[in-house]
Amino acid sequence: MAAMWRAAARQLVDRAVGSRAAHTSAGSKKIVGVFYQAGEYADKNPNFVGCVEGALGIRDWLESKGHHYIVTDDKEGFNSELEKHIEDMHVLITTPFHPAYVTAEKIKKAKTPELLLTAGIGSDHIDLPAAAAAGLTVARVTGSNTVSVAEDELMRILILLRNFLPGYQQVVKGEWNVAGIAHRAYDLEGKTVGTVGAGRYGRLLLQRLKPFNCNLLYHDRLQINPELEKEIGAKFEEDLDAMLPKCDVVVINTPLTEKTRGMFNKEKIAKMKKGVIIVNNARGAIMDTQAVADACSSGHIAGYGGDVWFPQPAPKDHPWRYMPNHAMTPHISGTTIDAQLRYAAGVKDMLDRYFKGEEFPVENYIVKEGELASQYK
């Protein structure tokens, strides 16, 4: 995988925005990593590298090059470990699963930052306009967890359609009531599934749905290549509001931007078919939290599943914890062991390029030379 990323690189163009762009200078760099704490699970798997204890598996490599690597899960508040190091760090690495929120205030406070890396996909934890204005480079490991997320989406579709969770709960409680499950269990075959967004995640999901003989629809800014569209058997829907009433299942695969924040509000949900299944592994803030909870309670949404919340971590009183017929988990879909190894390798590759003054694979850039990537504008 690293070889593929290297093959995509170009030589560095000497057009950086000021001294804070990702052009490294000689000498030791201070790198701060913010990851989730593994605790008792840290030693359960030698490939568990996405946690504080695993530190992406790059500590020895970084320290052998003379760099200072600080890893923590303590990211909130003025007295946090992150706050102590933010002024003189050069690189911040964080993940969507335990994000360090990089606000305009933090960017202003930091005196030496050059590079903000996401170990995984996503950037909504970073104030991108502020990062661009400060001349920072922001990058992610594109493609590192797309398979993981698409598989998880398919799993949640099946869990909700087949009414699996009440059956599992019956077993745990020592109960046995077939009717209590069967009265709202359905096959996936023949259902109409629509994805809102058909980028890397959406396309992989559509490909995995094809063997189930579903009617596949997708809405996106851009139409998929006609040959691939024909191969998958998916139909392009230019008008989202026209697509939603057709769908038995709606899957959210669009990034969180100012345009998509709160996109699925009460009015948008009302356009969907009564009894719709919704799966959202994109970002929680794309949904109106209370509107989703209310629609689940009324039965307009027959089941809602996903691993993304707003805010994260979800507070104990978050309404999605208690709404009926949900298949929610913490933010886990993109941090399988396989995904961790991919995004750890991607981070190492970009750090290596950064130290050498080389460019990253073009698809990894979120902010470069003061400009946001097109999908974030």
From Swiss-Prot:
Residues the record lists as binding NAD(+): T146, D220, P255, L256, T257, E258, K259, N281, D307, H331, I332, S333, G334
Question: What GO MF annotations does this protein's record show?
Answer: formate dehydrogenase (NAD+) activity; NAD binding; oxidoreductase activity, acting on the CH-OH group of donors, NAD or NADP as acceptor
Give the range of the organelle targeting sequence: 1-29
User: Where is it mainly found?
Assistant: mitochondrion
**Has UniProt tagged this entry with the keyword Oxidoreductase?**
yes
Q: Which top class of enzyme applies to this chain?
A: oxidoreductase
Q: Catalyzes what?
A: formate + NAD(+) = CO2 + NADH
Sorted alphabetically, the Gene Ontology cellular component annotations on this record are: chloroplast; mitochondrion
Pfam families in the cross-refs: 2-Hacid_dh, 2-Hacid_dh_C
As for subcellular location, the record says: Mitochondrion
Q: Which UniProt keywords apply?
A: Mitochondrion, NAD, Oxidoreductase, Transit peptide
Instruction: Please cite one Gene Ontology biological process associated with this protein.
Output: formate catabolic process
Residues annotated as site: Important for catalytic activity: R283, H331
Subunit structure, briefly? Homodimer.
What this chain does, per the entry, is described as: Catalyzes the NAD(+)-dependent oxidation of formate to carbon dioxide. Involved in the cell stress response.
Name the NCBIfam families for this protein.
Answer: PRK07574.1
In the record, the note on similarity to other proteins reads: Belongs to the D-isomer specific 2-hydroxyacid dehydrogenase family. FDH subfamily.
| UniProt-recorded name of the protein | Formate dehydrogenase, mitochondrial
- Specify the species: Hordeum vulgare
